[in-house]
Curated annotation (Swiss-Prot):
Function: In muscle, parvalbumin is thought to be involved in relaxation after contraction. It binds two calcium ions.
Residues reported to bind Ca(2+) 2: D80, D82, D84, K86, E91
UniProt: Ca(2+) 1 binding residues: D45, D47, S49, F51, E53, E56
Domain EF-hand, residue spans: 32-67, 67-98
Record-given protein name: Parvalbumin beta 1
Pfam families per record: EF-hand_7
One GO MF term: calcium ion binding
Modified residues (N-acetylserine): S1
Signal sequence coordinates: none
């Protein structure tokens, strides 16, 4: 949960900006919500494997709002620089920095 960590208006604005399929921009999204990389990674890595698997990333917008869309395959693969189907903390840091 992000209660007390993030501003609801920031979350709403960030989700609205990526509502259309293919419009999710990692760097812009995390800048809009104002959440640092390691905190985001820990929240998205639901199984605490130290990797964000594609299925976790695909549904991560729903962590912010239950009605949010799933990311497309292209959007989830954007951060997987070595193509292994999962994103490590270093890949994640690169992804959100741009």
């Amino acid at each position: 949960s992000f209660a007390g960590i993030l501003d609801d208006a920031d979350i709403t604005a960030a989700l609205a900006a990526c509502k259309a399929e293919g419009s999710f921009k990692h760097v812009e999204f995390f800048a809009k919500i104002g959440l640092a990389g390691k905190k985001v990674f820990a929240i998205i890595d639901q199984d605490k494997s130290d990797f964000v698997e594609e299925d976790e990333l695909k549904l991560f917008l729903q962590v912010f709002s239950a009605g949010a869309r799933a990311l497309t395959d292209a959007e989830t693969k954007a951060g997987d620089s070595d193509g292994d189907g999962k994103i490590g903390v270093d890949e994640f840091a690169q992804m959100i920095k741009g």
